[in-house]
Each structure stands twice: as C-alpha cells, then as structure tokens.
Regions:
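Catalytic cores of DNA base-excision repair glycosylases
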Residues: 2-215
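Short, basic, low-complexity termini and linkers enriched in Ser/Thr/Gly/Pro
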Residues: 215, 220, 225-228
Length: 228
C-alpha cells in the first residue's frame, strides 16, 4: 500500500464511520433475495418491494414452492423478469441441494442461478460475517478512480482490493466506497470540487475523468452488475 492509498482509506473511514448496508434484510435468505433484486436498481426501490415479498414468501421453502409468474408482479418495479426467475430457481436449488439452508461458501453460492461473485460476496459478508469484498458498480468505479485498484473488470478489482486492504476491513471498505460513490464520486458528474480525497486521488491528479473514458467505464460497470 502506498502513501496515497493509505491516506485515501483513512479519509474514507473518517468520512463514513457508520457506513452500513442500505438494503433491508434480516437473514441469509432475505439477503440473497434483496441482493439479486438490487442489480441495476436502487436500494430504496428494493426496500419498497421486499416487505411484501418477505411477508408472502417468508423463507426458502415458500419461495421454492411458487413460480416466477406469481413472484414477478411483486418485483417488476426492480426491472428484469429474469430476477423473478432466478430467485425462484435459486431457492429451488437450495431446497434440493442444501436442505433449505442458504449455503455459506463462495463455490456453493455461485452455483445458484443468477448469483455471481458480487451477490455471493454480499451474502457471505453481511449474512454470515465471513471475509468478503463485494464489488458493485460504485466500488468498481470509485476504487479505480481513486487509484486503490487499476483493473478492467470487477473480478480484477476484487482481487486487487483484497490484496491491498486488511481482511478485517474488507466489508467496511466496501461500504465506504459505495457511500462515496453515491454521495460524491458520481458516475457522470463526480463532485471533485467538494471531495476531500482529491489531494490523493489518481483520477483528479491525472485528469482521468472525462466523458469518453467515463462512457467506457459505465459500460464495464453495467457488464459487471449484470453478472451479479
């Protein structure tokens, strides 16, 4: 870790000491469902949808017994009918292969329909308290702009951040980067003028943020988000 990276992580911790998940969930099943729904959708929208979902489908067994056609009206405002199909299919696999219990390993989670490394990492970190570094669109964008990573994919970004940041801080750093991405380091118009990280930021110092580059970065972000 170089001096700039150390300053950036310290400042992120100072800025967002109480950063935490903004999705509402209370157990591994709810974490899995909410995270699948959150792909390319705001947490606020997901939080509006999930109370009815969890009321009528309170556990893996109930979800496995329904159909995508029944579930879809509950979640259609979150976009993509594939989300309903994947949620039902994932719960059926959990019933059949894992005794109705959401698995707690990366290998098992990513074997579920519609579950990629990001979704699996969220479940591991926030449902099971296991070390994981979920990389969503905000983490990918902000970490690469700041110089905490230098990668063309979410998978590379995940590996680089895990190598850079102490394991005990992975989940916290995930939230620091999300908070900063939502509040300051926006995708299209980053508020560099009010960013206290500017003195150490690679993008700010090299004038990396420009419309053409950001268009390509957003394309990469969308590809990564679509892959869960």
């Amino acid at each position: 870790m170089d001096e700039n990276q150390s300053h950036i992580l310290s400042e992120l911790q100072r800025l967002y000491p109480d950063a935490k998940p903004e999705l509402n969930f209370s157990d591994p099943y709810e974490t899995l469902v909410a995270t699948i729904l959150s792909a390319q959708c705001t947490d606020q929208r997901v939080n509006m949808v999930t109370p009815a979902v969890f009321r009528d489908f309170p556990d893996v067994h109930a979800m496995a017994q329904t159909t995508p056609e029944v579930l879809y009206p509950y979640v259609k405002s979150c976009g993509f009918s594939a989300k309903a199909r994947n949620i039902v299919a994932a719960c059926r696999v959990i019933e059949e292969r894992f005794g109705g219990q959401v698995p707690d390993t990366m290998e098992a989670l990513t074997s579920l329909p519609g579950v990629g490394r990001k979704t699996a990492s969220v479940v591991l970190a926030f449902a099971f308290g296991k070390p994981a570094m979920p990389v969503d669109t905000h983490v990918f964008r902000v970490s690469n702009r700041l110089g905490l990573s230098q990668a063309d994919s979410v998978e590379q970004t995940e590996r680089q951040l895990m190598a850079l940041i102490p394991e005990e801080d992975w989940s916290k750093a995930h939230h620091w980067l999300i908070y900063h991405g939502r509040r300051v380091c926006h995708s299209q118009k980053p508020d560099c003028g009010h960013c206290t990280l500017s003195p150490w930021c690679k993008a700010h110092s090299t004038v990396m943020i420009n419309p053409k580059r950001d268009i390509e970065n957003r394309r990469r972000e969308k590809r990564g988000a679509t892959n869960g």
